[in-house]
């Protein structure tokens, strides 16, 4: 059965559907020697040859793909980009290496925001989770600086006008603090750029700390260090797939034995420590080079 080219490539982990549509439009993809155009359909067969930038890539039938999802604790200061020309740290630096696929970020967090960021090998899953029409909840813990009264909270719940259209928090709940430094937990069902910060700024309140603590029903895992990752289990992965009307997985690569889990936790801690040392040396070297 034929499928849209971008869907096949997204499912195989070569990018989100939007990313792949862009590279197809740029003429960077060929199918059996012919430059592909947006809207082309392909049937995945053993003889199918798809190239991106001239490089032959691997694609499999849907039934052969195993969808994997990571929960990553993004620290402040990391960029949500695959490569940075200035050599700054990115969210992809610490992720486990893959063969024949790559990690795709489910949305973005700005450089000054920390917390839960999901990654998957399934571009179609990433695309559906990000799409506003799916209305997947994102929850944030927010520390704000400024006077917050009932009128401002009412405006944030009912909606305010931003430069890219109206926006509102689905829920907003006070969670602690005193005076002009207070914490709130807020939820949104879309992921516009800096939306949480811009909503508070629209009522004259500044955000001094922002942490994403939940995506759908997937929470930021307890005990996960900043810069650490953990792979979602079978049930969690299928929960996300069901949330966006994708068929469930029937197999998983997640180890279930306790000793394997302990080994993974130790690997995560070592990777976080090693990456921090490398990043620190890189920053130190940068300062020396700049005098």
From Swiss-Prot:
Question: Which residues does the annotated region (Disordered) include?
Answer: 272-291
Q: Does the keyword RNA-binding apply?
A: yes
User: What are the BP-aspect GO terms?
Assistant: enzyme-directed rRNA pseudouridine synthesis
This enzyme catalyses: uridine(2605) in 23S rRNA = pseudouridine(2605) in 23S rRNA
Family according to the record: Belongs to the pseudouridine synthase RsuA family.
UniProt-listed PANTHER family: PSEUDOURIDINE SYNTHASE FAMILY PROTEIN-RELATED, RIBOSOMAL LARGE SUBUNIT PSEUDOURIDINE SYNTHASE B
Q: What is this protein called?
A: Ribosomal large subunit pseudouridine synthase B
Its gene? rluB
